Amino acid sequence: MQGVADILFLKGVDLGIVRSDTLDYLEKKGYANNIKKQFTFITKLYNEEMHVLAPKSINSMAELEGKTVAVDMPNGGTFVTSAIVFERLGIHANFAYIEQRLAFEKLKKGEIDAMISVQGKPSKFNSSVKDENLHFLPVDYAKSLQPDYLPAQLTSEDYPSLIPKGERIDTIAAPAVLAAYNWAPNTERYRRLARFVDAFFNKVATLQQPPFHPKWKEVALNAPLAGWSRFRPAQEWLDRNSSTLASADTRRRFDQFLGDNQARAFARPEDREALFRQFMDWQKRQPMTR
């Protein structure tokens, strides 16, 4: 929620990163009316996964009924996502507003029953956890969560000290959004945002390559966002570059098709390129669907 407040009220701030579920939460809880009309979105960025850390004596989200769960501070994204998820799953937990490091100490001492963090994997904090008595709880992709969240997994590659080798934990992810204040088109602030869009969109392909963070690969510039209006210069850029984006999307689908295990088998660039050409030939032979 802090990101939303900064965009609305902090002098000189034109845009920021917010979770896609935050504006809906503020509106439904009566904190603001028609708040989405004050915002526009540039693009969907990366996904932030829900990490529910608990003792091994607790095995499911349902077992957190009536338990004490740390959800970080009440003005943060972890709190908002936790509040929405627990409400939609019908789980009534006692939320404790405790900073992450302190919450971890309380969890180890048994003073709380679980702690939640919603962060892009692998998160620095969860990667540092080494306690054989703790594990991640699975978060099922229930129908009630599907309008606002995406299915995700935490793997042993992400957290080797918390997840046994070769295993995966189902969870959900909240999309992070690059959002901006909805300035009028005839203002200098609007024109500055338009210049930013042009510079940023032209650099995204570079940011999706090493040595930059793997999360950049989740950025899909042309991905729609339900209930949000896209900044007009951003949409105009997408319209001008639609063919280039289609090619990039094909490459991304190919990488997903390969998967982690197959990717290791085709580690050499020349092997991956040869397989990619076969993949493209296969796509061309597929019947058109309407």
Give the residues covered by each predicted segment.
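Pocket-lining segment of extracytoplasmic ligand-binding domains
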Residues: 20, 30, 92-188
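Short, glycine-/small- and polar/acidic-enriched structural segments
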Residues: 1-63, 70-73
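Bilobed "Venus flytrap"/periplasmic-binding protein-like clamshell domains
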Residues: 47-105, 109
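Solvent-exposed loop/turn segments at secondary-structure junctions
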Residues: 2, 21-25, 49, 58-60, ...
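Residue-level preference for short coil/turn positions at secondary-structure junctions
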Residues: 11, 65, 172-174
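Solvent-exposed, acidic/flexible segments
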Residues: 1, 19, 43-46, 71-79, ...
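Ligand-binding clefts/hinges and TM-proximal coupling segments of bilobed small-molecule sensing domains
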Residues: 74-85, 152-226
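An extracytoplasmic/periplasmic, membrane-proximal ligand-sensing/linker region
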Residues: 102, 108, 119-132, 136, ...
